Amino acid sequence: MMEKKRDFLSLFDVSDVELAMLIRRAEELRFVRQMREPHATRPGRMLALIFEKASTRTRVSFEVAIQELGGHAVILGRNDSQLGRGEPIKDTARVMARYCHGIMVRTFGHDVAEELARYASVPVINGLTDLLHPCQVLADLQTVYAHVANRETSPSGQAPDVLSVLRSVRYAWVGDGNNMANTWIEAAGLLGLDLALACPKNYEPDAKILAKAKGTGKGKIHLTQDPREAVSGRHVLSTDVFASMGKETEAEARRQAFAGYCLDQKLVSAADGKAMVLHCLPAHRGEEITDEVIEGPASVVWQEAENRLHAQKALLEWLLP
């Protein structure tokens, strides 16, 4: 009897133990690639990559990931499929599942990803929606784990427990209560993390996601409008653009609302002395983060970007039959 297919639309689609397993496997795959060892563990698998939103990191990392695992990617942009011409999502889902072993979608409405998953008989991965960005936060958590566990150069010795390491540090989010903030809230609720978020009034995270995360009874989630309060003594600082894709018309209003929320050196200095800085990219330097910080010693942004590849390989290995 075939096992029921799994989707990855939200961090809550996995358990804390499964998430830790994915992070550990992502680290193994990182070292395997550094050693230039072949790791074609999913030969012949076909992955559909559907993009209603433009992409750099998501497209390249998923395409490289499936190819290095021995599979192939079929890439569909907004003008390449009937989705952009009004075909029902459920029809696209059923057809793509007949051709491919998995579907990754990067779109605006989270309901699109949910409907694809509902009707596709193969795993569906959320490459980004306006509500959530679980693949990015999976890579972010891998980055935090590797940095804290001092495993950036060698896997020698027994690797520290993933969940213990992740729970040993305190996290801060500064900026828009967007899909990244929402997903960090999910991470806190799932893994039991200590998370503070600083967002301006009227730009808070999704209330339902916040309630669900708090409802787990795990971790600590604190909301404030004071960036300095949020970062004080924290070990991990994260931010994102103030005007996400699709919000460009609000850019000027958002710049005014987010005055004082820029992750600059003064704000970083209020965090723990060994704090690390994350940014999912692309960055608008001088707006949500300064050039000095993103290029500075606290930044782990480039390893974070690379880890999208390794984390998504681990995810594809786990999800694809």
Segment roles from a protein language model:
Residues 112-129, 249-271, 297-298:
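A short, gly/pro- and small-residue-rich
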Residues 36, 40-145, 285:
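Phosphate/diphosphate ligand-binding glycine-rich loop within oxidoreductases
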Residues 1-60, 64:
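Positively charged, low-complexity intrinsically disordered leader regions
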